[in-house]
């Protein structure tokens, strides 16, 4: 059965080049008492993300960077350091003026903060110093910060001022958590910004309310589910409500302004520590690459700076293997038009989810649960002093092998068939080149997730 689902969102859509979704949560309302900050990162000009470990003026830290050939990129887009300080941001549109969304200084400031800040107070002091400079840094952003003392807050920030929102303050965050997307409530242009990202704001709020209600918030559940949440906050459409029969039940579906989107580049939940716990036990759970097509891996800081090979920036390509692979999986989900071009706002839903549970998201979720379970065992051992860098390296090696096995199975066609028939409504691909109809050149092509031998 071939179906087309059209979700009428175009009239509601505003171009969001840097459209991120963030949640901060007080340790008062989490299942284990540890605070955390979460970000689903979108970046139209930086979708190939990777991890680096660097050393700032005071502290070693791990952070996510865009593709770059520099050994020390100028910007970090989220991360945590050995003192237990963590930071992320979302772009806040039109904070300084009703026509400008410039935010060129946020990445550099986050890099500086990771290298020298241990607490939220120290970050606030750095922010004050930055805004007091003769030539202010261009900022139009919502920073989220957390420290080993249990402090966790948003800073809605423009060029010359900021407002702090403390998640531990019940008058500010009655439910113990706060959500931000791409606007700021304190912006003088709040009423004329069209509240960019409001769809995702409403979706994130609904997820938190529906999933946890008055109960304790599970950090691992949030990072496992929220970056893959298929609910549209404004249209109140859940793509799980009418899913295709199987992977060949082509269902072209408009896919824009969900939390996961074409430009989603990575996701992270940075979890803090309990009172008195060693700050080195702060952990970043990171899905590098399109989150619907990648694993969430716990990242800790070690003396030798060990990282999984598949998530760190490679010395030759300057990209991460998992991110590159996840982008390939993403390309198999988004609609290919008959002229061979790819849509950025339409997916074949059957390739993402279906009743036979062979969609890429369903495969990812199942594998991600295993990665998370083993990762949580390791983190608990580290917290108890029952594991060290050797165990961390062994787990990372397992992640490398498991990811490569998973990807090869996910990207490889299910069966091999020989055909002389032409399917003019499907695309064929080989070595990354896509054809809108049956090619004439012999070879083994991917067609509808099957391997097709054309003679």
Q: Could you say what each language-model-derived stretch is?
A:
Residues 14-19:
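Sec/Tat signal peptide C-region and signal peptidase I cleavage site
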Residues 80, 146, 428-429:
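Hydrophobic alpha-helical segments, especially N-terminal targeting/anchoring helices
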Residues 411-433:
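Residue-level detector of functionally pivotal "anchor" positions at catalytic/ligand-binding pockets or at interdomain
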Residues 444-455:
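C-terminal tail/sorting-segment detector
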Residues 1-4, 455:
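Positively charged n-region of N-terminal signal peptides that target proteins for export
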Residues 4-13:
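Sec-dependent N-terminal signal peptides
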Residues 99, 103-142:
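Proteins synthesized as precursors that undergo proteolytic processing into mature forms
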């Amino acid at each position: 059965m071939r179906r087309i689902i059209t979700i009428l969102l175009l009239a509601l859509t505003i171009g969001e080049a840097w459209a991120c979704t963030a949640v901060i949560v007080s340790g008062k309302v989490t299942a284990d008492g540890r605070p955390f900050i979460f970000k689903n990162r979108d970046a139209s000009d930086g979708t190939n993300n990777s991890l680096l470990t660097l050393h700032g003026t005071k502290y070693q830290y791990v952070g996510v960077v865009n593709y770059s050939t520099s050994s020390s990129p100028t910007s970090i887009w989220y991360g945590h350091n050995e003192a237990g300080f963590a930071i992320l941001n979302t772009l806040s549109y039109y904070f300084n003026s009703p026509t400008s969304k410039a935010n060129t200084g946020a990445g550099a400031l986050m890099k500086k903060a990771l290298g020298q800040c241990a607490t939220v107070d120290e970050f606030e002091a750095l922010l004050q110093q930055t805004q007091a400079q003769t030539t202010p840094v261009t900022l139009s952003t919502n920073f989220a910060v957390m420290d080993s003392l249990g402090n966790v807050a948003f800073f809605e920030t423009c060029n010359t001022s900021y407002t702090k929102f403390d998640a531990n303050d019940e008058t500010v965050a009655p439910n113990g958590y706060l959500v931000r997307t791409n606007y700021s409530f304190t912006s003088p242009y709040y009423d004329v910004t069209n509240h960019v990202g409001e769809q995702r704001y409403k979706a994130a709020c609904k997820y938190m309310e529906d999933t946890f209600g008055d109960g304790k918030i599970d950090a691992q559940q949030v990072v496992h589910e929220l970056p893959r949440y298929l609910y549209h906050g404004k249209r109140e459409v859940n793509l799980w409500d009418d899913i295709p029969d199987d992977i060949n039940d082509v269902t072209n579906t408009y896919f824009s302004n969900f939390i996961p989107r074409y430009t989603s580049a990575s996701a992270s939940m940075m979890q803090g520590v309990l009172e008195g716990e060693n700050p080195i036990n702060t952990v970043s759970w990171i899905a590098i690459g399109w989150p619907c097509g990648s694993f969430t891996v716990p990242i800790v800081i070690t003396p030798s700076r060990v990282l999984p090979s598949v998530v760190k920036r490679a010395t030759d390509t300057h990209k991460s293997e998992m991110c590159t692979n996840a982008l390939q999986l993403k390309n198999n989900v988004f609609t290919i038009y008959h002229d061979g071009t790819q849509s950025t706002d339409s997916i074949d839903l059957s390739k993402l989810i279906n009743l036979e549970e062979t969609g890429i998201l369903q495969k990812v979720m199942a594998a991600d649960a295993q990665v998370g379970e083993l990762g949580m065992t390791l983190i608990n051992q580290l917290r108890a002093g029952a594991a060290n860098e050797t165990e961390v390296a062994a787990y990372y090696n397992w992640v490398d092998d498991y990811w490569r096995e998973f990807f090869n199975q996910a990207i490889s066609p299910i069966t091999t068939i020989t055909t002389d028939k032409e399917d003019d409504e499907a695309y064929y691909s080989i070595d990354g080149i896509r054809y809108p109809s049956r090619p004439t050149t012999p070879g083994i092509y991917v067609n509808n997730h099957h391997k097709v031998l054309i003679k």
